[in-house]
Regions:
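Residue-level recognition of the N-termini of beta-strands and the immediately preceding loop/turn
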Residues: 54, 87-91
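Active-site metal-binding core of divalent-cation-utilizing nuclease and nuclease-like domains
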Residues: 22-50
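Acidic-basic catalytic patches of nuclease active cores, encompassing PD-(D/E)XK
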Residues: 1-32
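Conserved catalytic cores of phosphodiester-cleaving nucleases, focusing on short active-site segments
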Residues: 13, 41-47, 52-65, 71-76
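Short, charged, amphipathic alpha-helix that recurs within catalytic cores of restriction-modification
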Residues: 67-83, 92-98, 102
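Domain-level recognition of nuclease-like catalytic cores that cleave nucleotide substrates
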Residues: 90-135
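Alpha-helix termini
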Residues: 20, 47-50, 79-86
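Conserved, well-folded catalytic cores of nucleic-acid-processing
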Residues: 16-23, 77, 81, 110
């Protein structure tokens, strides 16, 4: 079911990543293995140059507290797997079909963007004054 949700999220998340955040490269389903360690990223987006930023999107059908921990772990391990991106600002986005208001608040407090599905399209669901936390 996970890849169905990821497939559902990709078109609208790609639009958000390119139009709102200026990402040039958007890669779904990135899997990396190094020295016996593995990292799986639902969507990796980045741009070089002046922005020099990367976004990692974790897609969930039903977001839970563990979803926050999982996204944090991916962000913390990212530079070991992608040393070529070590100087980029790095942000996380949790995209979910089902998400409680309480969990949404926790995700925002962690400095992650929240994306939710609305009319079969994922949209960012963040307050106007939201400040993302770089990792």
């Amino acid at each position: 079911f996970g890849s169905f949700t990821e497939g559902l999220a990709l078109p609208s998340m790609e639009t958000i990543l390119r139009q709102r955040f200026g990402m040039e490269v958007v890669s779904p389903s990135v899997r990396v293995s190094k020295n016996g360690q593995h990292l799986e990223i639902d969507v990796l987006a980045y741009t070089n140059g002046q922005l020099n930023t990367a976004y990692i999107v974790e897609v969930k059908s039903h977001a839970r507290e563990e979803s926050i921990t999982q996204l944090k772990s991916i962000l913390q391990r990212f530079r070991r797997f992608f040393p070529e991106h070590k100087d980029k600002k790095l942000y996380g986005i949790l995209a979910a079909v089902d998400l409680s208001p309480e969990l949404r608040e926790k995700i925002l407090q962690e400095g992650f963007y929240v994306a939710r599905i609305h009319d079969q399209v994922f949209e960012l669901d963040i307050p106007d004054n939201f400040q993302p936390r770089p990792y």
